[in-house]
């Protein structure tokens, strides 16, 4: 029996998008052999309004619209809604997706969509900031998700991204002043002073990306007026419970560029020979001095400094840097740097909150008193309490990692590989990544190699799965698979998130098995990686990865396991027929 569909297209101007979408969907319905009744909201052509008879005949109602649509007439029908732009790239695939994902519209849902409260919400102006530790994938994917969902609901939105290249699409004072709502989707510390007096909602990039509609709804319901100087103790305690991870990730995000630059410059020095840097006055020696003697020397102080900065703002930076330098000089390594950062940050915050000075001396507090007392406290604790034990732990860990047998190496590779694929850029993934980056300062390069190789597997595997099992994926998913494969080559695990969000019970296990195998093989082959990011493009730097061929084999094997594994696990009932 021929499928009958009712289609409504609408865009704010009622000119181009609405007419183009109507034409594309009409042609696509003919291609599929479906009968379509189309209502095109336009300001330049006389539009047809769906009759009651046409709506009753329709098996499915599709609303490709940016704006408010009268929903009451569709109560009891299977309805699919999307932004108008979603239907233009692949209209046939869009119609198939609509047929699969449409849900019955209840009277309550229709009333909610048409109510004055909802109409007022649809006119809201939103400003947002997204930021993640590495500033590569989650930052921009979360921004795109927010923009798409807000546009779908009829809101005006502007998102400032704080990525690895700095702040882009920056919010102006006028835009902030005009905003009805501020959304902060960040996994690191973001300055909020400019949002004083605004309704503000905080969330993570992961939740924003995976549950965009829910988080947008939560933002309207749970946003509270922000005041940088008058936050309640309850709010501060609630923030602090989830703040430790955010403080750590702030330190890691600022440390990463230093480590990447240093690691690649060290790798360049090896072009002239593995031990060429020992000859003074040579270019190799200069490169080693820049990368190893300077960049890597700054790694732990920067980590500790920005952990403290995240906790106590600028007054925490100096004691954090000093504590980090002491951690480095005492051999406490990155673990000592983490401890130093939290010591410095919380001691500086305690002094700022508890020490009260006369108004005439208040200006001395952030410049003199806090840095002096917090640095003294942090330094003494690092030297007399923390330094020794942490140094012993780091020495033991480094010695174990450098001298462990193949069995232990494989086990470590399995654990690190599985962790990298467990939550695709989440806390477990970042814990494994931070562990590998921290060991670079101790000239331990094998775990970092296993971590990056395993981290590439999920996105590469999903790309492979969409290629070898095309009939099980709709057109949009196949396009996402191509993008995922490219992201995987760049060591951006988040390319697999769209697949994991739809089918987590199959995607995550397939990724973890592939990642664990890749991590194990990388450790077994003795692969070493000098830089903690860049994916296969690091191969352009001689000696940045060794041995290259075996490293590529490890990645290829894990990718094949994940790709073929997911292709087999994906239920045939989920298959998307290519033909109508």
Curated annotation (Swiss-Prot):
Q: Which GO cellular component term is one of those annotated?
A: plasma membrane
**Transmembrane portions of the chain:** 254-274, 292-312, 322-342, 367-387, 408-428, 448-468, 480-500, 507-527, 537-557
Which Pfam families does the protein's record reference?
Answer: PTS_EIIC (PF02378), PTS_IIB (PF02302)
Stored PROSITE patterns: PTS_EIIB_TYPE_2 (PS51099), PTS_EIIC_TYPE_2 (PS51104)
E.C. code: 2.7.1.202
- Give a yes or no for keyword Cell inner membrane in this entry: yes
Chain positions found as Phosphocysteine: 11, 132
Task: Please list the reactions this protein catalyses.
Answer: D-fructose(out) + N(pros)-phospho-L-histidyl-[protein] = D-fructose 1-phosphate(in) + L-histidyl-[protein]
Q: What's the protein's topology in the membrane? A: Multi-pass membrane protein
**CDD domains of this UniProt entry?**
PTS_IIB_fructose
Q: Where does the record place the PTS EIIC type-2 domain?
A: 244-579
Q: Which domain of life is it from?
A: Bacteria
Q: Which NCBIfam families match?
A: FRU, PRK10474.1, PRK10712.1, PTS_IIC_fructo
Q: What does this protein do?
A: The phosphoenolpyruvate-dependent sugar phosphotransferase system (sugar PTS), a major carbohydrate active transport system, catalyzes the phosphorylation of incoming sugar substrates concomitantly with their translocation across the cell membrane. The enzyme II FruAB PTS system is involved in fructose transport.
Provide the protein name.
PTS system fructose-specific EIIB'BC component
- The gene name on file is fruA
């Amino acid at each position: 029996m021929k499928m009958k569909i009712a289609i409504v297209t609408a865009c704010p101007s009622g000119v181009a998008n609405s007419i183009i979408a109507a034409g594309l969907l009409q042609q696509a319905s003919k291609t599929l052999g479906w009968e379509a009744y189309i209502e095109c909201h336009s300001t330049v052509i006389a539009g047809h309004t769906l009759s009651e008879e046409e709506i009753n005949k329709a098996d499915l109602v599709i609303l490709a619209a940016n704006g408010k649509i009268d929903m009451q007439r569709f109560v009891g029908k299977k309805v699919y809604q999307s932004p108008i732009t979603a239907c233009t790239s692949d209209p046939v695939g869009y119609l198939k997706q609509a047929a699969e994902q449409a849900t019955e519209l209840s009277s309550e849902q229709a009333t909610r969509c048409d109510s004055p409260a909802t109409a007022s919400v649809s006119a809201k102006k939103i400003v947002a900031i997204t930021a993640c530790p590495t500033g590569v994938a989650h930052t921009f994917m979360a921004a795109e998700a927010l923009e798409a969902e807000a546009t779908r609901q009829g809101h005006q939105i502007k998102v400032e991204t704080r990525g690895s290249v700095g702040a882009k699409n920056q919010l102006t004072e006028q835009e902030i002043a005009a905003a009805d709502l501020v959304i902060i989707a960040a996994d690191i510390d973001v300055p909020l002073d400019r949002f004083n007096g605004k309704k503000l909602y905080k969330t993570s990039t992961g939740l924003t990306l995976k549950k965009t509609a829910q988080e947008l709804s939560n933002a309207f319901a749970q946003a509270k007026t922000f005041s940088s100087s008058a936050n309640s103790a309850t709010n501060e305690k609630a923030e602090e419970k989830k703040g430790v991870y955010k403080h750590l990730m702030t330190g890691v995000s600022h440390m990463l560029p230093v480590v990447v630059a240093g690691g690649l410059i060290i790798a360049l020095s090896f072009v002239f020979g593995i031990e060429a840097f020992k000859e003074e006055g040579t270019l190799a020696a200069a490169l080693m001095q820049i990368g190893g003697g300077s960049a890597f020397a700054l790694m732990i102080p920067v980590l500790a400094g920005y952990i403290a900065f995240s906790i106590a703002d600028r007054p925490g930076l100096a004691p954090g840097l000093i504590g980090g330098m002491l951690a480095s000089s005492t051999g406490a390594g990155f673990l000592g740097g983490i401890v130093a950062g939290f010591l410095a940050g919380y001691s500086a915050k305690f002094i700022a909150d508890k020490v009260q000075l006369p108004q005439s001396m208040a200006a001395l507090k952030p410049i003199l008193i806090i840095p002096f007392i917090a640095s003294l406290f942090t330094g003494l604790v690092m030297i007399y309490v923390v330094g020794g034990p942490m140094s012993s732990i780091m020495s033991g860990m480094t010695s174990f990692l450098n001298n462990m047998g193949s069995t232990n190496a494989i086990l470590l590779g399995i654990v690190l590989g599985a962790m990298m694929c467990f939550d695709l850029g989440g806390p477990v993934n970042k814990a494994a990544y931070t562990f590998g980056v921290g060991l670079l300062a101790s000239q331990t390069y094998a775990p970092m190699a296993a971590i990056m190789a395993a981290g590439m597997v999920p996105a590469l595997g999903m790309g492979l799965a969409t290629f070898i099992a095309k009939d099980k994926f709709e057109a949009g998913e196949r396009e996402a698979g191509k993008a995922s494969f490219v992201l995987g080559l760049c060591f951006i695990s988040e390319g697999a998130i769209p697949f994991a969000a739809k089918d987590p019970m199959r995607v995550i296990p397939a990724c973890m098995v592939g990642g664990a195998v890749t991590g194990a093989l990388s450790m077994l082959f003795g692969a070493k990686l000098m830089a903690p990011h860049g994916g296969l493009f690091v191969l352009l730097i001689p000696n940045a990865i060794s041995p290259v061929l075996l490293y590529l084999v490890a990645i290829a094997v894990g990718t094949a396991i994940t790709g073929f594994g997911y292709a087999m696990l994906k239920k045939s009932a989920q298959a998307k027929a290519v033909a109508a």
